[in-house]
Design a protein with these regions (language model features):
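Soluble "head" domains of membrane/secretory-pathway proteins
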Residues: 2-10, 44-211
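N-terminal signal-anchor transmembrane helix
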Residues: 36-46
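Cytochrome P450 fold signature focused on the C-terminal beta-domain
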Residues: 34-35, 121
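Hydrophobic membrane-insertion alpha-helices, especially the h-region
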Residues: 13-31
């Protein structure tokens, strides 16, 4: 009988240990860290297709939302936990694609679709692309994949290679391309932006999202 009790006690302790381990791992993945698989070659050579990365959620704070509502493509409310840091230029970020169902007229996050890209500009920066190279006014730091920028700069007729050169905000008067872009000021908290025609084109969707 004592032997049976010992075996039962061992299994009970093991069950409690496994349960606590699962709970701790779940909470760590929810609030602290999570992993993602790189789905394409767009981040090469730094990250290759199939690589896995570990994301630190504590920098800007974990997001909490109803996963089941998101899976059903319903509107959701996102609550962000407090974070303890800020992003830096050239950091690798994981974020949600800002549009759904190929609708480009307004921002509507698809929280189940993740992108992995490099941070080029920060709030308060003014971003430009000149002759294919990324530039931040007042910053001499090399940004992004320099070799890829150099290859794009050396292409005389990128359209022949299936490259779409037109880009945001897709306005004929501004005529921005992936080789000649900006200047695009990145607003920061507390900054006032004058709503002229250009700024309306640049920030209309962001203003609509924040409202």
């Amino acid at each position: 009988m004592n032997r049976v009790k010992k075996v039962v006690a061992i299994f009970e302790n093991l069950a409690v240990f496994l349960f606590c381990t699962v709970v701790i791992l779940f909470l760590m993945q929810l609030f602290c860290f999570t992993s993602f698989r790189i789905p394409s070659d767009s981040m090469e050579p730094a990250l290759k297709d199939g690589d896995r990365i570990l994301v630190n959620k504590m920098i800007k704070g974990a997001r909490l939302f109803d996963v089941f509502a998101a899976l059903n493509n319903e509107d959701i409310t996102i609550h962000r936990m407090p974070g303890w840091g800020n992003f830096k230029r050239n950091d690798i970020l994981v974020f949600n694609f800002p549009y759904r169902m190929n609708r480009w007229d307004s921002i509507r996050l698809d929280v189940m679709q993740y992108y992995v890209k490099r941070c080029i500009a920060l709030p308060g920066d003014t971003l430009e692309i000149r002759e294919g190279f990324y530039k931040i006014r007042g910053c001499d730091e090399r940004l992004g994949n320099y070799n890829a920028q150099q290859s794009l700069a050396n292409l005389k007729y990128p359209e022949q290679y299936g490259i779409v050169v037109g880009t945001f905000p897709y306005d004929k008067q501004m005529d921005w391309t992936i080789r000649e872009f900006g200047p695009l000021p990145i607003p920061q908290k507390g900054q006032t932006v004058k709503m002229n025609r250009t700024n309306c084109l640049l920030y209309r969707q962001l203003i609509g999202w924040e409202q």
